[in-house]
Amino acid sequence: LVGWNYRGHDGRWPQIFPVEPELGGEEGLRSLIETAKKLDYSIVCHTNSTDTYSVADCWDPEDVVHLRDGSLSVNDCGWSGGRMYHLCAEPALRQAQELLPQVAKLGFTGLHYIDVISTIPPRACYSDKHPMTARQTAETWREIMRLSRSLFGGFSSEGGYDFAVPELDFGLYVSFGLKPCPLADECVPLWQLVYHGYVLSNPYTTTVNPSASDLLKVVEYGGRPTFYYDSRFVTQDETHKNWMGEEDFHCATEADR
């Protein structure tokens, strides 16, 4: 469940609460979770432990990854919260320890989804207050993953970087695409050969909401069939695309359902 947090999808991370009032607030969310469980569906939600916005009520520039020159590390992608900064793993763990138990108390159970944490490289931080090597960042992120497993029953995220695999139950996609290389005769699915049967996954982004040809690739690569509602949310231009393809699903109206 994406966008349930305050101000919706990527609106205020790492701030989560209050539950977005325009969607019914906490009362509406608890009702949704209860209804899903009565229908025998497992329902989990989307949180974030790697990004931070200055509009968040918990914003503190000291929590941001510091570069060698002391400046703050900025993420090139801006979402609905505006300019996004990279959150250092040490304060991220502290915040997760405070917030994720509150999220679990709402009633979510299953493979809790933390955005992008398994599909981005661990970053070094040069802050005087919380210096971290990239290796320490990976170890700290795994602590957050283990916390998710203990609270919700499992952990999932967006990708399948090796450092995350010991704690990863499901990666939404292994890579962004399967693009042919003119220097290669064939593509060998090495990741799947190594981790198949250990981590559930999809081959690449467009095998989520797959077309007929992509669905064959899901089968070939031993993927987990996955369908993502309202995945085409990007205002497209030459540099911004809907990375999960052009297939989409909706359930807002009776006709959609």
Where are these regions (language model features)?
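Active-site-proximal substrate-binding groove within the catalytic cores of carbohydrate-active enzymes
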Residues: 69, 87-112, 117-257
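Aromatic-lined carbohydrate-binding/catalytic grooves of carbohydrate-active enzymes
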Residues: 1-97, 105-113, 118-130
